[in-house]
Amino acid sequence: MNFLSLFVLVPMVMLLGLWLAKGVKAVRGVMVVGSAALLALAIYLTIDFLGQRAAGNDAEMLYQASFTWFEPLKISYRTGVDGISVAMLLLSAIIVFTGTFASWRLNPNLKDYFLWFTLLSMGVFGFFISIDMFMMFMFYEIALIPMYLLIGVWGSGQKEYAAMKLTLMLMGGSAFLMVGIFGIFYGAGGETMNILDIANHTNGAHPIEFAQQCIWFPLTFIGFGVLGALFPFHTWSPDGHASAPTAVSMLHAGVLMKLGGYGCFRIAIFLMPEAANELNWIFLILTGISVVYGAMSACVQTDLKYINAYSSVSHCGLVLFGILMLTTSSTVGAVLQMLSHGLMTALFFALIGMIYGRTHTRNVNEMKGLMQIMPFLSVCFVIAGLANLGLPGLSGFVAEMTIFVGSFQNADTFHRVLTIMATCSIVVAAVYILRMVGRMLYGVCTDEHHKQLTDATWEERLAVICLIFAIAGLGLAPAWMSNLIDSSVAPIIETVKNAGPLVSSCNPFM
């Protein structure tokens, strides 16, 4: 059995264990063992991958395996990973592990909740190990379907509305994506769904005509971009985050939204380089709007989850922004931003859930003096805010600076003006983060109920500390992760840049 398949097999075993489990303790035990096993697999994979790269193995994808699943459409179960995939698998494993402890005391129906949560996790892991377009799409759908029930049943507020809105928007994106994938398949000769074969024009695949690329590129980019909160398709995100239970918000913002950026790079840009060079300016404008609009929208919110949700729109916009700049540095920064945002937004949502569970409010104006009442949670909240601001020594600084420096390497005025506009989001972020921290944590608490609140429990402390260590580790020692990502990004970006547009640029700003 292929090693990578364990990332799908372990969640399957977890599903069986949860189905057979009797009682809350058994359910928790299955989740702890399963999520710990996934984290151990991800750590081992990362170490072994780095070792193989150091030993000179420069293959595009490692640990490849395949078997034919549906011959008429050339669909196969194909697995393989590069540095980007390994980074995303590690992120996913960390958040599944910490999300398990963040949901420790969830009621009611903890068993059913973890069943759907595990199915969602399986879809995410399967997506990142797949190198067959259809298998990626299948796991993508597996990851989306549980979201409706997890929000609609275990959510809060306008949960039914938020669940339906999220499902309809993401399924609409899936429709674009399916058309784009089959367009790529038939445009490349209809012989293979293997991403590497299509990119390298092997095993019967031939180059996709430029005219076809200009049709399928926007469809696939929008299809994945909807999940990445691309403006103006982002409106599902704030409502979905605000209504989702804590661990679902963590996995949703921390990992699920990264499927969008990963898919845009892996399929849209990698397989259609000429169209990417020709049409990227359109989506650069949209992502630039996402970055600034998300940050400014966060400034006018008073609900903690909405603040973090709009902040996520801004940060995920920055991921797509870095990818579309088509430089090695900006793309490495975009992947680092996926990691950084995944960790810090998971930390934020975990802390918001813990605070809400005690105060029964998410309104910033209804909380004061929490630093004296819940010092552990408050200090962790400050750390999450500083990571969001891009404080040196934490993950946000490394990711954002790499994106901005890489973006500015484009010598033309259009790209540089957009980069300068995007950097303004850092200033705006300072407004909503510092205001939120100041109002919530300091001052004199006048609410008698709040004065009786307790600090974090042991399982909450474990989840939060794991995330903080990961954020600090990435910020203090980013070189190993940057090298891991660069080994996979650099050859792809070089290929894309060498392809160039096949017609004179249609960008009116160039």
PLM feature spans:
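Transmembrane helix-loop-helix hairpins at membrane boundaries of multipass inner-membrane proteins
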Residues: 2-3, 17-101, 105-115, 191-192, ...
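Central hydrophobic cores of alpha-helical transmembrane segments in multi-pass inner-membrane proteins
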Residues: 5-20, 34-45, 89-103, 120-122, ...
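Alpha-helical transmembrane segments and their helix-start/interface "positive-inside/aromatic belt" motifs
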Residues: 25-36, 161-171, 374-379, 458-466
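Hydrophobic alpha-helical membrane-insertion segments
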Residues: 33-50, 170-182, 377, 381-389, ...
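Membrane-interface helix-loop-helix modules in multi-pass inner-membrane proteins
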Residues: 61-87, 133-136, 140-148, 389, ...
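Hydrophobic transmembrane alpha-helices and their helix-loop junctions in integral membrane proteins
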Residues: 98-104, 122-134, 148-439
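Cytoplasmic juxtamembrane regions at transmembrane-helix boundaries
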Residues: 101-116, 246, 448-459
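Cytoplasmic/organellar membrane-interface segments at the starts of transmembrane helices
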Residues: 374-376, 433-510
